[in-house]
């Protein structure tokens, strides 16, 4: 990453299920500029916000930056991919509108399984890709409703390619 990371980065969440909503919600709760790609849950979250019941303290975000397409979100500093790996074939079409004109946009995968970081590196270059492992127990209760039972630690690493 050639440019310094901004103090208040613009963050896109791709895959707004339990993992994406929990970590994106925590980032938004602490003042970050977080934008969620939402499809089926869009209208519910737009109207009622994001509700997180957590062992670390419940919170509600009444206003959420939710979008139906990545083109609506536009360029970001960080893209967090938290969708199921079975949908990875959609990523080469979803991520480009989120990338800036230079190499500064980073892509962090918080997906289950192996190979997601390699796939992203092949598509967008290894210098942009970070791998993440989530040690957390969470569940999506319904549209805009997440329950966090335990832990929440994330380990990060640069792509080795």
Regions found by a protein language model. Give the residues of each.
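NAD(P)+-binding Rossmann beta1-loop-alpha1 motif at the extreme N-terminus of oxidoreductases
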Residues: 2-58
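Rossmann-like NAD(P)(H) cofactor-binding subdomain of soluble oxidoreductases
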Residues: 60-147, 155
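Short glycine-rich loop/turn motifs that provide flexible caps or phosphate-binding loops at active sites
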Residues: 14-19, 23-24, 48, 112, ...
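Conserved anion/nucleotide-ligand pocket segment
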Residues: 150-161
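Solvent-exposed alpha-helices and their adjacent loops that cap or buttress functional pockets
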Residues: 4-5, 146-149
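A generic "binding-loop/recognition-motif" signal
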Residues: 41, 113, 152
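Short, surface-exposed acidic/glycine-rich loop or hinge patches that mediate macromolecular interfaces
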Residues: 39, 85-86, 159-161
């Amino acid at each position: 990453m050639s440019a310094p990371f901004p103090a208040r980065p613009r963050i896109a969440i791709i895959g707004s299920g339990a993992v994406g909503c929990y970590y994106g919600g925590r980032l938004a709760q602490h003042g970050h500029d977080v934008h969620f790609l939402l499809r089926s849950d869009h209208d519910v979250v737009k109207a009622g916000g994001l509700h997180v019941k957590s062992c670390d303290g419940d919170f509600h975000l009444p206003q959420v930056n939710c979008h139906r397409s990545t083109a609506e979100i536009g360029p970001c500093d960080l893209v967090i991919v938290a969708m199921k790996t079975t949908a990875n074939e959609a990523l080469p079409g979803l991520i480009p509108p989120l990338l800036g004109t230079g190499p500064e946009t980073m892509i962090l995968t918080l997906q289950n399984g192996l190979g997601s970081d390699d796939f992203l590196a092949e598509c967008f270059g290894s210098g942009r890709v970070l791998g993440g492992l989530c040690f957390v127990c969470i569940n999506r209760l319904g549209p805009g409703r997440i329950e966090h039972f335990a832990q929440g630690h994330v380990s990060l690493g640069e792509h080795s390619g």
